A protein has these predicted regions:
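Switch II (G3) loop of P-loop NTPases
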Residues: 1-28, 49-50
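Short, surface-exposed amphipathic charged segments that create phosphate/polyanion-binding patches used
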Residues: 2-6, 88, 111-118
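Conserved catalytic network of the ASCE P-loop NTPase/AAA+ motor domain
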Residues: 3-8, 36-41, 64-67
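Conserved beta-strand/loop subsegment of P-loop NTPase cores
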Residues: 13, 41-48, 65-102, 107
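Conserved Switch II/interswitch segment of TRAFAC-class P-loop GTPases
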Residues: 18-23, 38-57, 80
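Short, function-defining helix-loop hinge/capping sites that tune catalysis or transport
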Residues: 22, 83-84, 111
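Charged helix-capping and loop-helix junction motifs
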Residues: 26-32, 58-62
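Conserved phosphate-handling catalytic cores of large alpha/beta enzymes
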Residues: 104-128
C-alpha cells in the first residue's frame, strides 16, 4: 500500500479515534507507524484536545510514547478558557507543539503553534 503513495509529498494517516486504553488498537497503530518509518521519511503527530482533563492527557501521552516519538497538535483551543495544559504537557513530554486548531474550518483554522501568542493568552492577554 505504501507504494501507492510514493509520488505524494504528504500522506496523512488517521487512526480514526483509536483508544489509548485499547491495547490491540495501540499495537496496530505501532505496527502501522513502524511500517511507514521503514519505507519513508515521516513525522508523527499526536493530536490532543485542549479540552481534555490534564490527568487524562498524561495517560494518553504516556501510552503513545511507547509507540513513537511524536510532535503535538492541540485542537479545540476555541472551546477552552484554560491553556495551561499545553505548556504542562510540552514540559512533561519534551515534545514540540507543532500546530493548534481554533475552530472547525479545515484547513483555515489550523495554525502553526506560536509560543508567544500562547504565553500572552496564558497571562490573560487578548487574542487578536
Amino acid at each position: 500500500a505504501i507504494n501507492d503513495f510514493k509520488e505524494f509529498d504528504y500522506v496523512f494517516v488517521d487512526t480514526m479515534g483509536h483508544s489509548h486504553r485499547n491495547e490491540e488498537q495501540r499495537d496496530n497503530t505501532k505496527k502501522l507507524i513502524d511500517c511507514i518509518e521503514r519505507h519513508a521519511e515521516s513525522q508523527c503527530y499526536l493530536v490532543l484536545s485542549a479540552t481534555t482533563k490534564y490527568k487524562d492527557l498524561l495517560r494518553i501521552v504516556d501510552n503513545y510514547k511507547v509507540i513513537a516519538d511524536y510532535h503535538l497538535i492541540f485542537t479545540k483551543l476555541d472551546e477552552t478558557y484554560t491553556l495551561g495544559n499545553l505548556l504542562n504537557l510540552k514540559l512533561y513530554t519534551n515534545a514540540s507543539i507543532a500546530y493548534v486548531t481554533c475552530g472547525q474550518n479545515v484547513p483555515e483554522d489550523i495554525e502553526v503553534f506560536d509560543p508567544q501568542k500562547t504565553v500572552k493568552l496564558l497571562l490573560g492577554g487578548k487574542n487578536n
